[in-house]
Design a protein with these regions (language model features):
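Juxtamembrane helix-loop-helix connectors linking adjacent transmembrane helices
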Residues: 12-84, 91-97, 172-176
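Hydrophobic alpha-helical transmembrane segments
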Residues: 28-33, 68, 72, 104-109, ...
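Membrane-interface helix/loop boundary segments of multi-pass membrane proteins
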Residues: 81-109, 136-143
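Alpha-helical transmembrane segments in multi-pass membrane proteins
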Residues: 1-11, 29-30, 184-187
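Membrane-interface helix caps and helix-loop-helix hairpins in membrane proteins
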Residues: 116-122
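Structural signal for the C-terminal ends of transmembrane alpha-helices
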Residues: 5-15, 137-141, 196-206
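C-terminal membrane module of polytopic membrane proteins
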Residues: 152-210
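Hydrophobic residues within alpha-helical transmembrane segments
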Residues: 77, 109-113, 125, 129, ...
Length: 210
């Protein structure tokens, strides 16, 4: 809350209703699909790479999930605060400072910072990939709204998954799918199809900011 208030008060993240006024509702549907389609493949990749959350992080995450304010913190406040800081402030400044030919460098730098602040490899790699997608959407729109929607969808899915299946954090994907790797691979393939379709749609629907 303090981060959101500070960045809004100091105008480090300019606030504008210009993007919302365009009523890009169907575009946001594809943003949600992009988030949902990326979650399972990224989890599969980190598991296959042998990366695990540190026990302290798992304990903290479980505590937040079971908290009365857990949904507010994870699904609402965290997406707004992180998008204001990393896309609305840091990436915005880098895009303004870099020549257009180097805009992807600005996105990579911001994504790397986004990964580093998570302070562990499992979340860090996931956050880096997510940061590339969020940065691309911000570069196209110069609005943090798509990023907030993406973040909201990703965190909301995780929140309700662990609420419905409290032991999910202690299981691998194979264990979660009944020790059947074929089922896991089919689920990952289906998720990648959703991800690919969403990325294709957003490439056309997110018009580059001129």
């Amino acid at each position: 809350v303090l981060t959101i208030a500070l960045f809004a008060w100091r105008k480090w993240t300019p606030m504008s209703g210009q993007y919302i006024n365009q009523r890009p509702w169907f575009t946001q549907f594809w943003v949600i699909c992009l988030a949902l389609g990326s979650a399972l493949p990224m989890t599969f990749f980190t598991e296959q790479a042998g990366l695990e959350l540190p026990p302290d992080y798992t304990k903290l995450f479980k505590g937040m999930i079971n908290s009365d304010l857990g949904f507010l913190a994870l699904a609402i406040l965290a997406p707004i605060a992180e998008e204001m800081v990393f896309r609305g402030a840091i990436l915005r400044r880098l895009l303004d400072a870099f020549d257009k030919r180097w805009h992807w460098s600005a996105i990579v730098i911001t994504a790397a910072l986004f990964g580093i602040v998570h302070l562990n490899m499992a979340q860090g790699i996931n956050a880096f990939v997510m940061g590339l997608l969020l940065g691309w959407m911000y570069m196209r729109t110069r609005s943090i709204v798509p990023g907030i929607i993406f973040h909201f969808a990703n965190n909301t899915m995780a929140f309700f998954l662990y609420r419905l299946f409290p032991n999910a954090a202690d299981k691998t994907l194979v264990e979660f799918y009944g020790d059947n790797m074929t089922n896991v691979l089919m689920a990952v393939a289906f998720s990648l199809m959703i991800f690919g379709a969403a990325l294709y749609q957003l490439n056309f629907r997110l018009q580059p900011k001129r």
